[in-house]
Amino acid sequence: MKLILLIIAAYLLGSIPTGLWIGKYFYGKNLRDYGSGNMGTTNTFRVLGPKAGLLTFTVDFLKGTLATLLPMWLGVTHISPLLFGFFAILGHTFPIFANFKGGKAVATSAGILLGFAPFYLIFLLFIFFFTLYLTSMISLSSVIAASIAIITVLIFPALHFLLKDYDFLFVLIVISAGSLIIIRHRENLVRIKNKTESLVPFGLNITKQKTH
């Protein structure tokens, strides 16, 4: 029973539509009606500004971390904490509190890694921010970091680099979350191809997108 309750709690925690609620209750704006219509960090940053964007990222990030750590704090050790983190990702992507139309799972997935493999997270964050500096695009940085995660989660354990051993559930969740992130960015990839993707106000914009 405790296991079922924790899975439900992880899903409900992930379902909290941070950006949507911040926009509605503090800015009087429905993010669905602005920008890309997404309630994640990128659109929140673009529509509501850096403070709201940073707050959205932080809360969405911590949803993944809390969902991963809470079972361990409650003494549930016979099940991998990653299972609960995965349900937080599902909640974030398909939130019951927002008509099952959620974010792209980047921040929440990163939060899970903080609770389970922090040094691996640092590696992926380096990839993300380095790509962000080169391209000025959060979307492309997210896709590249997700792609690198899918590749390295299969390679690093064999090299005993950052990931000591193969954990089947960890590999499965990283591949699943990474694939979900890439799929959720399909429209962004089309805009990148057309050179019309939105940019952050810094970086080199090496792909020469036309919008700022």
From Swiss-Prot:
<feature type="transmembrane region" description="Helical">
    <location>
        <begin position="143"/>
        <end position="163"/>
    </location>
</feature>
<keyword id="KW-1208">Phospholipid metabolism</keyword>
<keyword id="KW-0812">Transmembrane</keyword>
<protein>
    <recommendedName>
        <fullName>Glycerol-3-phosphate acyltransferase</fullName>
        <ecNumber>2.3.1.275</ecNumber>
    </recommendedName>
</protein>
<comment type="similarity">
    <text>Belongs to the PlsY family.</text>
</comment>
<dbReference type="InterPro" id="IPR003811">
    <property type="entry name" value="G3P_acylTferase_PlsY"/>
</dbReference>
<comment type="function">
    <text>Catalyzes the transfer of an acyl group from acyl-phosphate (acyl-PO(4)) to glycerol-3-phosphate (G3P) to form lysophosphatidic acid (LPA). This enzyme utilizes acyl-phosphate as fatty acyl donor, but not acyl-CoA or acyl-ACP.</text>
</comment>
<feature type="transmembrane region" description="Helical">
    <location>
        <begin position="165"/>
        <end position="185"/>
    </location>
</feature>
<dbReference type="GO" id="GO:0043772">
    <property type="term" value="F:acyl-phosphate glycerol-3-phosphate acyltransferase activity"/>
</dbReference>
<dbReference type="GO" id="GO:0008654">
    <property type="term" value="P:phospholipid biosynthetic process"/>
</dbReference>
<feature type="transmembrane region" description="Helical">
    <location>
        <begin position="69"/>
        <end position="89"/>
    </location>
</feature>
<feature type="transmembrane region" description="Helical">
    <location>
        <begin position="110"/>
        <end position="130"/>
    </location>
</feature>
<dbReference type="GO" id="GO:0005886">
    <property type="term" value="C:plasma membrane"/>
</dbReference>
<keyword id="KW-1003">Cell membrane</keyword>
<keyword id="KW-0472">Membrane</keyword>
<keyword id="KW-0808">Transferase</keyword>
<feature type="transmembrane region" description="Helical">
    <location>
        <begin position="3"/>
        <end position="23"/>
    </location>
</feature>
<keyword id="KW-1133">Transmembrane helix</keyword>
<dbReference type="Pfam" id="PF02660">
    <property type="entry name" value="G3P_acyltransf"/>
</dbReference>
<comment type="subunit">
    <text>Probably interacts with PlsX.</text>
</comment>
<keyword id="KW-0594">Phospholipid biosynthesis</keyword>
<keyword id="KW-0444">Lipid biosynthesis</keyword>
<comment type="pathway">
    <text>Lipid metabolism; phospholipid metabolism.</text>
</comment>
<keyword id="KW-0443">Lipid metabolism</keyword>
